[in-house]
A protein has these predicted regions:
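Glycine-enriched, solvent-exposed interface loops adjoining structured elements
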Residues: 1-200
Length: 200
């Protein structure tokens, strides 16, 4: 069975668990699987990278994108910024100018010095695709790793049914590891490997 859309995924889950009375629960299994998938560092892959320009307020705060998972790099006018603790950043005497540092404060980034209107801040980060739903039939993760979605949802179904989900868990872990291996192979193919450390 093809696994390219939300409807096909739901139908496949129903076939695998061989139950006709869990139609209302299957979307929950998928949602729980999504939560687990995107909390896993192994899903930090190039297809989930995004670049945005950040706007700041008068105090040097910028709201983190709603689909943010983890930072890769943050630049001001093409120069990388150094991340420090919020306590350290807040101890500095306020001043305006081209930022050198940033820190995270809940759902915001704080920059120092406070950027001016002439400064451009660019964030490169890993993002979480929109959840699958009847109105969002697919996303990049389902396209890249349908087995991860399937086995992840089957693990949640096994929990719900009080059944042994170890074989589904094995399939889930195998799928994630293959996704990571494929991603690394594609990233490094034909080039000198360069590993960048991410930070949440």
């Amino acid at each position: 069975m093809s696994l390219t859309t939300y409807s096909e995924l739901k139908a496949s889950i129903a076939n695998w668990i061989d139950r006709t009375n869990l139609t209302d629960q299957i979307p929950d299994f998928i949602k729980l699987a999504e939560n687990r998938i995107f909390a896993d560092k192994r899903t930090r892959i190039p297809p989930l990278e995004k670049k945005v320009v950040l706007a700041t307020d008068s105090e040097g705060f910028s709201r983190i994108p709603t689909d943010y998972l983890e930072s890769i790099s943050l630049f001001c006018d093409d120069v990388p910024l150094q991340r420090i603790s919020l306590d350290q950043l807040m101890s500095f005497t306020a001043q305006s100018g081209k930022p050198s540092y940033f820190a995270r404060h809940t759902y915001m980034f704080k920059f120092f010095p406070t950027p001016t209107s002439s400064n451009q801040l660019e964030l490169i980060y890993y993002y979480q695709p929109a959840d699958l739903s009847d109105s969002n039939a697919t996303n990049i993760m389902l396209e890249q790793a349908p087995s991860v979605y399937l086995y992840g949802a089957l693990v949640e179904a096994a929990k719900y049914l009080g059944a042994d989900g170890s074989r589904w868990e094995e399939g889930y872990q195998t799928g994630l590891n293959k996704l990571l291996e494929h991603s690394r192979g594609s990233e490094f193919s034909g080039s000198t490997p360069v590993m960048q450390a991410g930070y949440a």
